[in-house]
Amino acid sequence: MAEEQARHVKNGLECIRALKAEPIGSLAIGEAMAAWSEISDNPGQERATYKEEKAGGSGLSKPCLSAIGSTEGGAPRIRGQGSGESDDDTETLGIPSRNLQASSTGLQCHYVYDHSGEAVKGIQDADSIMVQSGLDGDSTLSEGDNESENSDVDIGEPDTEGYAITDRGSAPISMGFRASDVETAEGGEIHELLRLQSRGNNFPKLGKTLNVPPPPDPGRASTSETPIKKGTDARLASFGTEIASLLTGGATQCARKSPSEPSGPGAPAGNVPECVSNAALIQEWTPESGTTISPRSQNNKEGGDHYDDELFSDIQDIKTALAKIHEDNQKIISKLESLLLLKGEVESIKKQINKQNISISTLEGHLSSIMIAIPGLGKDPNDPTADVEINPDLKPIIGRDSGRALAEVLKKPVASRQLQGMTNGRTSSRGQLLKEFQLKPIGKKMSSAVGFVPDTGPVSRSVIRSIIKSSRIEEDRKRYLMTLLDDIKGANDLSKFHQMLMKIIMK
C-alpha cells in the first residue's frame, strides 16, 4: 500500500513538472471542458469504454497519463495512475472517440480499479480518504461518498458573460480521490502554473476554467465533530471523530455590561442561570466520541451540572478531617513504635539484673567458705593489754568449722581444751599460741601500717616525694619542696621536714 501511494505521488509530481515545462493549450482545455459538460447532460454515456488514444501534440510524458474521474454532477477530479489500471481498457467520462481523435490534448483516460480488479464507479477501495467539505449546504452526495476538502478540480457555473465562476464545493461530486495521489505541495505548484498562464494572456477564455483549491492552512484546524473516513488496508472504513477537550472550566465569570446600546431587538435572558462562587469541572460526553461516563458523573448530570456551595464546603471539611485523622494516626503509630523500643530495653535491663543477682549469690557462697585471720591474739603475755577481754564473737580463724586449725597453733590439744572448757561452764576459744606463730609487737620507731616514720634510707625519701607530688599544692611550691628535700641529710631533719609537709597539706 505504501509503495503504491509513493508511486502515485511520484507520477503526480512528474505530471506537474511536465505541465510547467510545456503548459497545455487553452483550446485543448476548452474542448475537454465542453466534453465534460456534455457528459453531465447524458449520464448514460458515463461508463463507455474506449481504447487508448496517443497524444498528438501535448508533449506529456508517460507518467503523466492520468485518469480523469467522472462525476455525476459534472465536476471532474484528477486521479493518479493506480495499481489496477489497464493498458487496453480506459475509463472515460462519456467523451466520444471522435472527439479524442480530433483533439490535440494528448490526454488519455483510464479505468480506476479496486484491489480485486473490478472497475468501480466511485472510489471505494480501502486506502481512500473521504472528507466532507462542509463549505456549501446545497452540495449533494452520491452513493455515500463525501466531498473532499482537498479536491483537485472544481467547475463553477458560467456567468452571464460566458466565463466560468469558481465555486468551490458548489457542484455535486460523487467521485472520491486518494489522499496520497496529490499532496498539499502539488496544489501550490498548480496554482503557480495557473498564475503563469493568466499572465501570458495567450489563451482565450472559454466556458470552463480549471480551478484548484488553495493548500489547506494547518493553523485553521477544525474542532467540530466531523467524521473522517480513513484507510484500514481493507475494504472497510474506520470512522473517527474530532472532538474538543472533554473538560471545561467550572464557574463562568460575569460579563461586563457593554457601553454601546444594541441596534436590534434584545434577546430574552430569563433562562440564564445565576452566578455561583465555585463549581466543579464539567465532563462533556458524546456518543460518537467512544468514551464512557463514570456513575459518579452520571449522578452529577442527573442532579445538576454544578455542585452546591454548601455540599462542596462539607466535602472540603470532610477531607480536612480525614487528613487530620490520618496525621493523628501517624503520631500514635510513632509513639507505639517508641514503646516497643522501650519494652525491648526493659527486657534487656531485667536480664542484666538477673545476671548480677547470680554473681552476688556466687560471691556470697565463696565468702562463706573463706577463712579470715584476725590479728591481735599474738600478744606477749607480759603485755598489760594481754588480759583485756576481746569481743567474744571474734575468733582467731573464722570458718564453717569452729575447731579448724586450732590444734596446729595452740599449745594444748583440742581434747584437753574442750574438757577444761566444759568444767568451766563455757567453751573458751582463747589459748596460748606457739612462739613461732606469735606476732611480734609493733615498733614505734619503725614504719608500719599504723604510721610512717622517716629514716635516712632512700625508701623514706621516695615516700616523701610521692606525698609532695600527690598533694594539691601549687607547682611552684612543689618544686621548692623538692629542692629542700634534696638538701636534707640527717634523720631528724628529715622527720621535721615530714611533719612540716603534713601540716602544709592538712591546711
Swiss-Prot record:
Residues 286-301 have a biased composition (Polar residues). Residues 42-91, 133-163, 201-227, 252-273, 285-307 are annotated as: Disordered. Keywords: Phosphoprotein, Viral RNA replication. Residues 304-376 are annotated as: Multimerization. GO terms for biological process: DNA-templated transcription; viral genome replication. The modification Phosphoserine is found at S86, S151. It holds the Pfam family Paramyxo_P_V_N. Residues 1-48 are annotated as: Interaction with N0. Residues 361-377, 396-410 are annotated as: Interaction with the L polymerase. It comes from the Viruses. InterPro entries: P/V_Pprotein_paramyxoviral, Paramyxo_P/V_N, RNA_pol_Pprot-P_XD_paramyxovir. SUPFAM superfamilies: Phosphoprotein XD domain. Residues 457-507 are annotated as: X domain (XD). Residues 144-160 have a biased composition (Acidic residues). GO terms for molecular function: RNA binding; RNA-directed RNA polymerase activity. Phosphorylation on serines by host CK2 is necessary for the formation of viral factories. Residues 260-270 have a biased composition (Low complexity). Essential cofactor of the RNA polymerase L that plays a central role in the transcription and replication by forming the polymerase complex with RNA polymerase L and recruiting L to the genomic N-RNA template for RNA synthesis. Also plays a central role in the encapsidation of nascent RNA chains by forming the encapsidation complex with the nucleocapsid protein N (N-P complex). Acts as a chaperone for newly synthesized free N protein, so-called N0, allowing encapsidation of nascent RNA chains during replication. Belongs to the morbillivirus P protein family. Homotetramer. Interacts (via multimerization domain and XD domain) with polymerase L; this interaction forms the polymerase L-P complex. Interacts (via N-terminus) with N0 (via Ncore); this interaction allows P to chaperon N0 to avoid N polymerization and non-specific RNA binding before encapsidation. Interacts (via C-terminus) with N-RNA template (via Ntail); this interaction maintains the P/L complex anchored to the nucleocapsid template during the sequential transcription. Interacts (via C-terminus) with protein C this interaction allows C to associate with the ribonucleocapsid. The N-terminus consists of a long intrinsically disordered tail. The central part contains the coiled-coil multimerization domain (MD). Forms a four-stranded coiled coil structure. The C-terminus constitutes the alpha-helical domain (XD) that binds to the nucleocapsid (N-RNA complex). This is Phosphoprotein. It comes from Measles virus (strain Yamagata-1) (MeV). The lineage of its organism: Viruses, Riboviria, Orthornavirae, Negarnaviricota, Haploviricotina. The gene is P/V.
